Structures are given as structure tokens and as C-alpha cells.
Amino acid sequence: MSKTAFKGSPVNLAGEFINTGITAPDFTMVKGDLSQFKLSETRGKFVVLNIFPSLDTGVCATSVRKFNRLAAKMNNTMVLAISKDLPFAQGRFCTTEGIENVIPLSDFRNPSDFDVNYGVLIADGPLSGLLARSVVVINPEGKIIYTELVPEITQEPDYEAALAAIK
């Protein structure tokens, strides 16, 4: 069982955080228009999964804004912002913040067990049921080439390390 922390207190995750070198498990999520999005549709591109608890927290919102700015400069790369927020809340945030280079995806239906397969489901503590802050980078062939499980949920991910995996 992987662990992270929330405000200094240990938090358990359901299962093990995903490793590099394996084929990324496919998943289905919900887009803002309530249509489905499948990871398998991204083959041929680099994919950055920016995974976080909720857009209603400052650090999560900051990570989406930063990845949005970075995504504008990346070629052949998609950035997916993944949380359990409802698609309506994600859409409102993206509209208000001018987010145009990141695709917000909701795992609220969880038909493909993304949270368990990637080892990012928070299993206990005050954020139980939400997703742990993490970043996963997938290459155009569908292999995971970079992962970061942020050790403290209240901290931002290492943006530069994620981008370095793509270059």
C-alpha cells in the first residue's frame, strides 16, 4: 500500500502507486460535455496525467493553471487534469480561469477503476475517496515513462521533472 501525507499526517492509498516501464492501463472518464474520454484515444501523443483531489483547493487549481501554461508550449502532448470533481465544476473552473490547453476529466463515475489501477485513491483520512496528487507521463506508444506521487498533498508536483520526461 502506497502512502502520502495530508498536512503532515500519513495517508494510505488503495493499492500501489503505478510504476514506470509498463503499459498505461486504459481508462474511461467523463468530459465536461458528459461524453466519455478513453486514454486509448491518445495513442501517438505524449500524455501528462495531472491527478489531484479537487479544483476547489488552491494547490490543485494552481497545478491546472501551470500545466495549462506549459501545455501551450508542448508539441504532440496532451495534458489531462483528473479529479473526482463533477464535470460541471471542472467546466466552470476552466471557463473562469481561461483554461484552454488542458482537458479536464472527471473520475466521478469510475467505470474503469482508474483510481485503483493507478494507485491514487485516498483510502483514509479527511480526503478519503478523492485522488492523491500525482503526475504520470505516458509516451506515444502508451508506456509510462515518469511518475510522481507527491509526498505531501498540500504541495505542488515537480513540473520540470514531468516535462523533462517528454523532451
Regions found by a protein language model. Give the residues of each.
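Chalcogenol-based redox active-site neighborhoods
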Residues: 1-167
